[in-house]
Amino acid sequence: GDGKMEIIVGWRVSMELQALTVYTLEKDGSRELALSDYVKYAVADLDGDGQRELTVLRADETGAGTADCYLWKNGTLTLGSSIRVSMTMAELSQQGRITLDVLRSSTPAQFVTDVADSTRAITDVLVLRGGELTNLVLSAMTGVSGESSRFCTLYPTDINGDGVTEVPRTVPLSGDEESTASQRIDWISYDASGLAAKALSTYHAVEDGWYLRLPEGWAENIQA
């Protein structure tokens, strides 16, 4: 928001390492603002100040998944905070995805979804509070997100058009618990405190590529 242009450059250093550099363009050339290894990254205004923050997903020195949030201070991009995320970077690099949108409270958020062993989706919900990145769904006891269910090729999205992103939570159908061809999906929204609420339920015929929005009261009565 300062009228200057920045460029993010990512490149593969080796088979197992990618690097990311942020440059600002000036009259006499470019100047490096930040350098990090990464698996995925996202750029978004997370605190409504008109400036977009940079979030970098990478593995720390122990191999644990980490999210680094870079903030603008006096024209310089600086590391503001780092937090744990649920997934390993090996998992995130495959079918993982970052979705940028808002919570029920209109708070900007990053939904980081990992697919473990191609069978289970785990989603972290990251927000910026007082300049500190926060994972709303990370359990202090287990160290992983409580938002986890069977993966059926669905990712967080605004499923009902209310302007809020919902997280898909797979619920096995009675009599067909092992099948992935058809699923009931509960779509979960969050507020800025991390409080979850079900927005709606859908029936998804995954292999056929269609879904049905379930009327209120139908969800518990659907069988395979």
Task: Give each language-model segment a name.
Residues G1-A224:
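Beta-propeller-forming repeat regions
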